[in-house]
Every structure is written in structure tokens, then in C-alpha cells.
Amino acid sequence: MGQKVNPIGLRLGVNRTWESRWYAGAGEYAKLLHEDIKIRKMLKERLKNASVSKIVIERPHKKCRVTVHTARPGVVIGKKGSDIETLRKELSKMIDGEVHLNLVEVRKPEIDAALVAESIAQQLERRVAFRRAMKRSMQSAMRMGAKGCKIVCGGRLGGAEIARTEQYNEGSVPLHTLRADIDYGTCEAKTAMGIIGIKVWIYKGEIMEHDPNAQERRLQESGEQRARSGRQAA
């Protein structure tokens, strides 16, 4: 079963948590869900060059807090913070309410599955050979501390007449193990020959405690540790 389902959905409530975190009263659920879809669609279009990994939406006390996880926060912020303020105003106007926009830097984009898939898609659109793009991304992930990596590309690879699927694996990716911290991301490369689909699984180790927020806490701790080591070196 672990081979078939989305690894993030399978681990929700075990060591992963939801990207939309709010409670809807009677008759409000559909409205809030459509707002979430519009917010994500708008941000992904506007920030397509900012390497956005995921967008978390929370709604405390009838407000809306949007947290964008990005590898390039400078692109989102803009000159003197002008771009992020414009985005915040547009989001507030779109949902007709107050919006707080926060940024979280992805410190290791090489082991973020969504960003790896996006990187491969961009390379394929630039006509880089698909095998080279897949191998390069896999080597970068393993070098940055991933325990295992699996990349699948499907479509008219190399401009072939007949579509096929190519797969590369390195290390272990235990999809059945619920305590395994597995990141999963997909992307589409729109090439002249047609669309090529990319799927990426990255195994980062095991999370032994039963904690839905464990993955986010580990990311935060690694960022703080890196900042401390930088200060000590200085």
C-alpha cells in the first residue's frame, strides 16, 4: 500500500501535519477551502521564480496567517520589502479579510522533494538531458545528508515517439515504514514534445516519537544549529 499512496498523506497525524490548519463552522468549510485554493494558486503563479516549497495556511481568530516556505526569501521580499507588502495587500483584497504573510527559509533545498522536482522540470524545459538532470539531483540530495532518494520521470523522454517512464534509486526509501521521514514532491515540465511528469521521494531518516509536528521542528532546530555554528565561527 505504501507504494501506491502519497507518502505525505499516509503519514498525516503520525509525523506530518496538514498544510491547511483551521476549523470551519457550519456552512463555512467550502468557502474557506476555496479561499485556500485561490491563495495557493495566486502565490505559486506570482512566486514561480522564488523556489517555493510549500504554503501553510492557518486561521486564528478570524484572521488568516500564510507561511511561505521558500529557498529564496530575498526574491519574495523584494527591494526594501515592497514586493511582500504588495502581495499581502492583494491577498487581503482577495479574501476580504486581514492576512499576515510570513516567510520561512528552506536551508537545504537539495533535500526538499518539491524543490528537487521543480529543479529537474526547469532543466528539462531548458533541454538538459533527462538522465543527467535526474542523476545530478540525486547526487546533490545524497551529498546533503539524505538517506535515500527515488526519482521517476514519465513522458516523451528525449523527444521519443512513444512515452515511457524512467526511474533512478539510491539508498533506501522505506515507503511502508510510517515512522520514516519521507518527503514527496511532484512537478510537470512543459516541453516542446509534451508534458513530462516528475515525482521525487527523499528519505531523511526516522522520527521515533509520535509527533505530527516533528518534521517542522527538526527543520527549525537544524536552522538554529546552523546559525549558532556560524556565530561561533565568526
Swiss-Prot record:
GO terms for cellular component: cytosolic small ribosomal subunit. Residues 215-234 are annotated as: Disordered. One of its GO terms (biological process) is translation. Residues 39-107 form the KH type-2 domain. One of its GO terms (molecular function) is rRNA binding. Signal peptide: none annotated. Keywords: Ribonucleoprotein, Ribosomal protein, RNA-binding, rRNA-binding. InterPro entries: KH_dom, KH_dom-like_a/b, KH_dom_type_2, KH_sf_prok-type, Ribosomal_S3_C_sf, Ribosomal_uS3_bac-typ, Ribosomal_uS3_C, Ribosomal_uS3_CS. Residues 215-227 have a biased composition (Basic and acidic residues). It comes from the Bacteria. Belongs to the universal ribosomal protein uS3 family. Binds the lower part of the 30S subunit head. Binds mRNA in the 70S ribosome, positioning it for translation. Part of the 30S ribosomal subunit. Forms a tight complex with proteins S10 and S14. HAMAP family: Ribosomal_uS3_B. PANTHER family: 30S/40S RIBOSOMAL PROTEIN S3, SMALL RIBOSOMAL SUBUNIT PROTEIN US3C. This is Small ribosomal subunit protein uS3. It comes from Maricaulis maris (strain MCS10) (Caulobacter maris).
